[in-house]
From Swiss-Prot:
It comes from Vibrio vulnificus (strain CMCP6). Folate binds at W184. Keywords: Cytoplasm, Folate-binding, tRNA processing. Belongs to the tRNA-modifying YgfZ family. This is tRNA-modifying protein YgfZ. GO terms for biological process: iron-sulfur cluster assembly; RNA modification; tRNA processing. Folate-binding protein involved in regulating the level of ATP-DnaA and in the modification of some tRNAs. It is probably a key factor in regulatory networks that act via tRNA modification, such as initiation of chromosomal replication. GO terms for cellular component: cytoplasm. Its main location: cytoplasm. The lineage of its organism: Bacteria, Pseudomonadati, Pseudomonadota, Gammaproteobacteria, Vibrionales. SUPFAM superfamilies: Aminomethyltransferase beta-barrel domain, Folate-binding domain. InterPro entries: GcvT/YgfZ_C, tRNA-modifying_YgfZ, YgfZ/GcvT, YgfZ/GcvT_CS, YgfZ_barrel. It is found in: Cytoplasm.
Length: 324
């Protein structure tokens, strides 16, 4: 259901402060839900995170791999309604749903794509707004009259609401402008939040998108699909890649399509990969998340593919890549 409120395009300058409060329509993300008597044990055997220990007021990162340890998806997992919900990139959901259902015939589970509306409340005033909306911002997962609120990071909350209650919720947040998903994407980029869009499925192991650094891998739980590769990456050091944020210049006339980079190798240049998510500022700059070799020299240079004059550089990570 389309909101009756106008949706603003979120265009910021690279030096501009983020809005103190805004709501993003997250139509580029989706939810897979799982219910049924076997939901906990079934999901526990499929994903990297510890489902069994997840409390009803908690949210955790997780990943779902194929048998070789390559990711079908990364997600934020939380209790929702009578089961679980997995928030992830919408473009990856069709394939992820198929793979997640592969063994469901042997268990008492129902796995579906939710038709709920996803809203992102963000900014330094987000927690105050959520407290007013739900009368409770103490827990990371809060059920309220119109839906469920999930704390994503200190300045971000996800709202999962029924389509017929979307306008009511937005009216309760009327002091915040309604923006497109670009602002939420920018927060993901600044926080270097793992993401797997459709084009990156089956390309990377969990550690290559820093899932271990955001507590999205349990090395103490029982077996799950792809576990051998994930464990080998930790204990034998076979992982050679990591997720980084890069920023640089871009031609003002460049269409906002996927950004691809090249990196310097001696006197030559080599393809460095495609942004998993990117954001274009309004002053000729852009930023995005890229999976790169984790042993690159500090002096490695980057440039836009096909635009050799547009130089990019790595930004500091907001967290350690250690999984301890």
């Amino acid at each position: 259901m389309q909101s009756t409120q106008p949706i603003q395009r979120c265009v910021l300058g690279s030096q501009q402060a983020l809005p103190e409060l805004a709501v993003s329509l997250l139509d580029n993300l989706g939810l897979i839900t799982m219910t049924g008597n076997d939901k906990k044990s079934y999901l526990q055997g499929q994903v990297t995170c510890d489902v069994v220990s997840l409390e009803t007021d908690q949210v955790t990162w997780g990943g779902h791999c194929d048998a070789k340890g390559k990711l079908w998806s990364v997600f934020r997992l939380f209790h929702y309604a009578d089961g679980y919900a997995m928030l992830q990139d919408k473009s990856a959901i069709d394939v992820e749903l198929r793979e997640l259902k592969k063994y469901a015939v042997f268990a008492k589970v129902e796995i579906n794509v939710s038709d709920a509306i996803l809203l992102g409340v963000c900014g330094v005033q987000a927690e105050q707004a959520i407290a007013k909306l739900t009368n409770n911002a103490e827990a990371a997962v809060v059920t309220f009259a119109q839906g469920t609120a999930v704390k994503i990071s200190p300045q971000r909350w996800l709202l999962v609401v029924d389509a017929n209650q979307q306008d009511e919720v937005l009216a309760m947040l009327a002091t915040a402008p309604l923006c497109d998903h670009a602002l939420w994407d920018l927060y993901d980029i600044l926080e270097v939040a793992p993401r797997i869009p459709a084009f990156a499925q089956n390309e990377h192991i969990p550690q290559a998108v820093n899932l271990q650094a955001v507590n999205g891998i349990s090395f103490k739980k029982g077996c799950y699909t792809g576990q051998e590769t994930v464990a080998r990456a930790k204990y034998r050091g076979i992982n050679k890649r990591a997720l980084y944020r890069l920023s640089g210049t871009i031609a003002p006339s460049a269409p906002e399509t996927t950004i691809s980079l090249e990196r310097s190798v001696g006197d030559n240049w080599r393809a460095a990969g495609e942004a998993l998510v990117s954001y274009h500022f309004d002053d000729g700059r852009a930023t995005g998340l890229f999976v790169l070799p984790n042993d690159l020299e500090p002096e490695t240079q980057f440039r836009l593919a096909g635009q050799s004059e547009q130089l990019w550089q790595r930004e500091p990570l907001p967290y350690s890549l250690d999984d301890e």
